[in-house]
Amino acid sequence: MIKAKILKIYLREGDKFEGELMYKHIMKILKREGISGATVYKGICGYGVRGVAEFDIFRLSVNLPVIIECVDIEENINRVLPKLYEVIKNNGLIIITDCHVYKGETYE
């Protein structure tokens, strides 16, 4: 068993950083910084301080919630946080929680 951290980043799918979709830019940062792995989830509905986001078949564009999730040791998560803050600024929410990894190739 390894003590680790879960990093979750909540965005909207249309959020951009320097012309690139923010979730794609963040995934590049996580990979470049050696985070063990990450997954992007697309929600079907959500709300927060920036309003309600939901799928509407009659609209051509949608701005649904997107969650980026990764698990790694605390040292690696802390190392990447300043880079994430720089990209996300006021466009999202970052949550970090403790977890235990019981099996994982990169931790053995």
Swiss-Prot record:
InterPro entries tied to this protein: N-reg_PII-like_a/b (IPR011322), N-reg_PII/ATP_PRibTrfase_C (IPR015867), UPF0166 (IPR003793)
Short name of one Pfam family: DUF190
Family: Belongs to the UPF0166 family.
Name of the protein in question: UPF0166 protein MJ1524
